[in-house]
Amino acid sequence: MNINENEYRKLLESIFNRFPSFQRVGGMAYKPGLERMESIANLLGNPQDKFRSIHIAGTNGKGSTSHILASVLNECGLKVGLYTSPHLWDFRERIKVSAGASASAMQMIEKEYVYRFLMQNMAKFEELQASFFEITTAMAFSYFCHCKVDVAVIECGLGGRLDSTNIIVPQLSIITNIGKDHCEYLGYELPQIASEKAGIIKEGVPAIIGEATEESVCRVFRERAQSCNSPIHFSNSASPQEWLSLYLNNLSPASSPDAAELSAFLQQLVSRMDLRGSYQQKNLRAVLAALSQLALNPYFAEALRRGTLAAKLAATPFAKGIEEASRITGLHGRWEHLVADSEGRLHFASSSAEAGYQVEIICDTGHNAHGFAQTGVQIAALAAGTDLPRRLIMIFGCVADKDLDSVIPLLPNEYAPGYKAYYLFVNASGSRAMPSQTLAKRVLAAGFSGEAIVAENSVMPAFEHYLAKLYRPGDLLFIGGSSYVVASLKIENAQ
């Protein structure tokens, strides 16, 4: 089926405009409850019941965890579906399928399938008053069924209990962590938020909990698991090395290397990961805990054995899946390095582009206090350096409903004696962006230095302003504050 590119683009725009999406209108797009999603799925023949799945929720880290786990399963030879949100540059980033380890990378859903699915079902969606996320979730389930995937890794959109994805009955449930975000929908106290996330734990289905240190939160998860007769494992109850050892032992009791070999392998694994942020080590621990349970599932065990025990650990498909998760799954915007060529165009550092400006550029989609508690410290430490500090320039934007009072104290300011970060405040893309002047006023009043770049979608103008007016060789430039800031970057060869 050949489609007209203009018709395809117009159809996608109509979906964004006619059906409420979180990217466009924020909370007004949130339609809690599963009745409408169940009706949509029923009209489509309940495709979600025709493939195995793994369900992942959490305040932060659920996207990275989804991609790492999908990458490992792919490299071990399974045909994997991957559903995540939001997208950065191409709607189709949300829905991907692999053909197993023989393929170089996971592939986005075909434009033809998107077009045909929307044209065939538009009237149904309008009649049911579906949300944008319900439509994309239905599309993902339908596509994974069509592709006959072995397993689909499904990331929750918002919350868990009432999220559109929660009509699946997975093989494993994972909750990465609990923090305060979207509190007006999920609750203002951590146990309330945990209760919403815990809604993805299903009857008899094993559950992995990532970061959970507060007893009140742990209690919520334990009680939910007990009521569902579900085995529950807290990944921070053991070290990554202990989870790796358990994974290998569950695959084959005779195969587990000694502690020294495991320690050396893990250090090498972390150093080679193309998902670079230090926070990825917490996500990796959750993935290893998840794999230790999948190793007990007969459906997954054989593929995992082939991918993990076929050679020395460092040379296995299992290791490759972790080390190259970003490349294999096409995940971008997680502590990602960029380069600027001699004409000021941005490229992924993983490309062959030659740097024309001697500046270290990092972009990250972290967008809430829980996220900045991780990235803020890492940015400041990187700028402070081990010998002489570097100048730190922050291109920063956020959405209008962001709780700035919780984020501002976590932003880098004076990161070394006599060195203060300089901020270029920007409008992120979309109608939800906080105006750069409003953002600047709030942050500068807290003792920061910087200026507002006044332009509609001012992210690229801010970068151009930096190159023209502020650039010095050796600078560290951070771009982030929101997924929409990173999505506004014009990166050569981005999807």
Language model segments and positions:
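C-terminal helical cap/extension that packs against the catalytic core
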Residues: A212-H233, E242, P257, R345-I362, ...
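Hydrophobic alpha-helical packing residues
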Residues: L69-N74, F144, V443, N493
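Nucleotide phosphate-binding/pyrophosphate-handling subdomain across enzymes
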Residues: V151-C156, S164-I174, G179-H182, Q192, ...
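Flexible active-site lid/hinge loop adjacent to a nucleotide/diphosphate
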Residues: A101, R116, M122-F132, T136-S216
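N-terminal phosphate/diphosphate-binding loop that engages ATP/GTP or pyrophosphate donors
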Residues: L43, H67-Q120
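Internal gly/pro-rich beta-alpha loop/helix module
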Residues: Q171, Y185-Q192, K197-I200, V205-S292, ...
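Short, high-confidence coil segments that cap the C-terminus of an alpha-helix
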Residues: A130, V149-D150, P389, R472-D475
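Short functional linear segments
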Residues: M1-G58, T65-H67, S71-L78, S102-A103
